[in-house]
């Protein structure tokens, strides 16, 4: 087999009230170069030592669950997606593993099938669907049924503020209530409905307003990310549409006019000097497989 590579974009989830449903692919990437067969799986990477370099690696273990018959290979993994920062690092690894199985096992999976499999692993479709399809996605998992709609948002730019501290998703979910009053659920879902409608109609000011009015999760996570209100205030003053937690946090996700993203990022970097401020774009391609002969040569 000709060596091939897989590129998977990062993602942000929720966009405020679109909890476990709305996702956006971002221009940070996990790259996997698949090299020669081997007696056992070898994962070449320069991440921290806690990231496995064998068949326990999330990419490899996912691939082997999808297609147990695939032969071990040497793979090289690089990524500029920060780990445990709310930017879909684990989702991108799961998606890469599914594509690894798809290619090595000649499964010929459709995009919809990849989304279904990835959602089964992840438990919700927002991050994985965005990484597979690119762009902005709205998804729902109902039992075993996954439904996803993709929309374009090319007029939008993204700024992300990434703190030095990690925040495990399980820890961030632990602060959420186990029960939600009916009247609060009605209010929260109505706001989410307007967010989705505004995304579809490209009414960006309304998108920004709705993404800052979440009731599902952000009020409970403020204790873990206390800078969110001040970042939100500054971003709005600098011309952003809206600000929200990126996934479970701790990163902050800002939607802005595409042409203003650099200026807004620069202004925020001067205020929040203890955080890494990234000017990003929405990735519209999703997962990419490259089978050109020069890969790995």
Curated annotation (Swiss-Prot):
PANTHER family in the record: HOMOSERINE KINASE, HOMOSERINE/4-DIPHOSPHOCYTIDYL-2-C-METHYL-D-ERYTHRITOL KINASE
A Pfam family this chain is assigned to: GHMP_kinases_C
Entry's Gene Ontology BP terms: threonine biosynthetic process
EC category: transferase
Record-listed ATP binding positions: 82-92
Protein localization: Cytoplasm
Lineage: Bacteria, Bacillati, Bacillota, Bacilli, Bacillales
Pathway this chain belongs to: Amino-acid biosynthesis; L-threonine biosynthesis; L-threonine from L-aspartate: step 4/5
Function: Catalyzes the ATP-dependent phosphorylation of L-homoserine to L-homoserine phosphate.
Known catalytic reactions: L-homoserine + ATP = O-phospho-L-homoserine + ADP + H(+)
Listed name of the protein: Homoserine kinase
């Amino acid at each position: 087999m000709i060596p091939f590579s897989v590129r998977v974009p990062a993602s942000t989830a929720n966009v405020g009230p679109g909890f476990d449903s709305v996702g956006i692919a971002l221009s940070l990437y996990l790259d996997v170069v698949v090299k020669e067969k081997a007696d056992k799986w070898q994962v070449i990477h320069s991440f921290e030592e806690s990231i496995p370099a064998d068949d326990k690696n999330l990419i490899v273990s996912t691939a082997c669950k999808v297609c147990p018959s695939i032969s071990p290979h040497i793979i090289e993994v690089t990524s500029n997606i920060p780990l445990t920062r709310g930017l879909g690092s684990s989702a991108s690894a799961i998606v890469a593993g599914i594509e690894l199985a798809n290619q090595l096992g000649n499964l010929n999976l459709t995009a919809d099938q990849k989304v279904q499999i990835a959602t089964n692993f992840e438990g919700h479709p927002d991050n994985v669907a965005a990484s597979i399809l690119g762009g902005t996605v709205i998804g729902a998992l109902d039992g075993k049924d996954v439904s996803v709609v993709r929309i374009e948002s090319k007029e939008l730019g993204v700024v992300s503020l990434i703190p030095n501290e990690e925040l495990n998703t399980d820890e961030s979910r632990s602060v959420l209530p186990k029960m939600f009053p009916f009247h609060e659920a009605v209010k929260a879902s109505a706001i989410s409905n307007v967010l989705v409608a505004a995304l579809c109609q490209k009414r960006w000011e309304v998108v920004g307003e709705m993404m800052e009015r979440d009731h599902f999760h952000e009020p409970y996570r403020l204790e873990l990310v206390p800078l969110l209100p001040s970042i939100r205030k500054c971003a709005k003053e600098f011309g952003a549409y809206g600000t929200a937690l990126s996934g479970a946090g701790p990163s902050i996700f800002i939607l802005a006019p595409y042409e203003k993203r650099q200026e807004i990022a620069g202004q925020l970097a001067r205020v929040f000097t203890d955080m890494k401020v990234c000017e990003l774009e929405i990735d519209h391609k999703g997962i990419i497989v490259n089978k050109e002969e020069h890969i790995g040569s």
